[in-house]
Amino acid sequence: MTNIFDTHAHYSSRQFDADRDAVMRALGEGGVVGVLECATHSGDAAAVLELAHKYPFVHAALGIHPESLGEEDAATVATYHGDWRAELAAMRPLFDDPAVIAVGEIGLDHHWPLPAQEQYDLFEAQLQLAQELDLPVSVHDREAHAEMYELLRQYRPRGVLHCYSGSAEDAAWLTAQGMALGFGGAVTYKGAKRAAKVLAMVPHELAVLETDCPYMSPEPVPVSYTHLTLPTIA
């Protein structure tokens, strides 16, 4: 398989520190023509941009992930002490870099004990930023469909709902609104019947591939090899 675009990845993760250059070369040699490299807070934005500047097929997305509200080593907590508004304001000039083509990874996560209202306000602020900059979004939605869909209906952003886990019914209106749906390693799991149903009914151009590396691998591939699995997922 050639001409692959990985629509959601984290190659700037520390897990790639030992062999990042080799991994990136392997991607280019393996038919990957594009990668959307996603930041999760201001602390990893520089590493994301460095990758995008070094490798022509890597494009950057900058944003504050909802989990960064509760991670002690994330800049949102470690540097800004939870003041995501100040952090987002400090990140604003970075969006002038032509390597930045999206706002992400942003969204809502109700799986972990994170402040719900702060998440909502942070996500809404970043949807507004994407609207202001006329950029697409890379969206994280974990166990937060109701609030997520409320804001997506309101702001109608372009972009990808990463690691889509919703129903076929919701997929219909999301794609009609112009959102693409991201599918990665989870579609290979034994319980992924809902994903199969969604994939059978959405337009092919709005069902996109992602690795979310190094965090999600298809069965039976070890997580450490997630970056090599796009053909397997497809």
PLM region spans:
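Surface-exposed, active-site-proximal loop segments in enzymatic domains
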Residues: 69-81
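A short, structured active-site edge motif that brings together acidic residues
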Residues: 59-70
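Divalent metal-binding pocket/active-site signature
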Residues: 2-4, 9-22, 34-44, 50, ...
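Catalytic domains of carbohydrate-active enzymes, especially glycoside hydrolases
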Residues: 28-31
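Structural detector of well-ordered beta-strand residues that form the stable sheet scaffold
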Residues: 36, 59-61, 138, 160-162, ...
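His/Asp/Glu-enriched short active-site or ligand-binding loop at hydrolase and phosphoryl-transfer sites
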Residues: 178-192
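Single conserved hydrophobic/aromatic residue that forms the stacking wall/gate
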Residues: 227-234
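Non-cysteine beta-strand/loop elements that form the S-adenosyl-L-methionine
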Residues: 61-63, 101-106, 206-213
